[in-house]
C-alpha cells in the first residue's frame, strides 16, 4: 500500500536515517580523538642531536629518532652544515637535562622524515615546555599544534619578554625555520 509523501511511515524512515547519521558521526569523532592520543613509552636517551631531536632506546631495544612535538630549536652545527646562534647551547642544555636518562615519551606519530613526534617527560617535567621557557626553543608553527599549545605559547611569550636564552639577540634573532630556508637545510 502506497502512503502519501509526508505520512508517518516516511517520517519514521527519515528519523531512522538521521539517527544512523548522528551515530556514525559520533563514532567518527571518537575514533579520530583516540587516534590523536599519544602512545606512551619509556626509553633511555642515547644521544642528543639538536635542541629538539634525540635518539632513545626503548625497553625492548627499539631505537627511536625523536623530534620534539610543538617546538623548534636553533640549528646546531653538524659536520657539513653550519649552525646558528644558540644552536650548540640548546643541544648542550637538552643533553644536560636528559642525556643518558630514562624518560617518558608521549609519541604522537611520525613526521615526514620518519622521526617520532613526541612530548618528552623527565619525571614530572615537560622537557618540550622547559626548552621553550628557558629560551632554547620557540613554538613550532609549521604544523597545527597537537599538545600543550597554550602552555608552549605562554612560555615563549615570557621568555621573549624576559630576553632569556636565544631571545637575548633581540632584532638579530632568526627563527630556525628562516635559518633552514636561508641555508637550504632539510628538516623541521
Predicted features, each with a name:
Residues 2-188:
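Small beta-barrel nucleic-acid-binding modules, primarily SNase/OB-fold domains
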Amino acid at each position: 500500500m502506497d502512503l502519501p509523501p509526508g505520512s508517518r511511515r516516511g517520517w519514521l524512515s527519515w528519523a531512522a536515517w538521521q539517527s544512523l547519521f548522528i551515530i556514525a558521526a559520533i563514532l567518527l569523532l571518537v575514533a579520530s580523538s583516540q587516534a590523536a592520543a599519544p602512545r606512551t613509552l619509556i626509553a633511555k636517551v642515547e644521544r642528543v642531536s639538536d635542541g629538539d631531536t634525540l635518539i632513545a632506546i626503548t625497553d625492548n631495544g627499539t631505537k627511536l629518532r625523536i623530534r620534539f612535538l610543538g617546538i623548534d630549536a636553533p640549528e646546531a652545527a653538524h659536520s657539513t652544515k653550519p649552525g646558528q646562534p644558540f644552536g650548540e647551547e640548546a643541544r648542550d642544555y637538552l643533553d644536560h637535562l636528559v642525556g643518558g636518562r630514562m624518560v617518558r615519551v608521549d609519541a604522537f606519530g611520525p613526521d615526514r622524515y620518519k622521526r617520532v613526534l613526541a612530548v618528552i617527560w623527565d619525571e614530572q617535567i615537560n622537557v618540550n615546555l622547559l626548552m621553550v621557557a628557558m629560551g632554547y626553543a620557540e613554538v613550532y608553527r609549521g604544523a597545527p599544534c597537537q599538545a600543550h599549545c597554550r602552555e608552549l605559547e605562554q612560555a615563549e611569550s615570557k621568555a621573549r619578554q624576559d630576553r632569556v636564552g636565544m631571545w637575548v639577540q633581540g632584532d638579530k634573532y632568526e627563527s630556525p625555520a628562516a635559518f633552514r630556508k636561508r641555508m637550504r637545510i632539510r628538516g623541521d
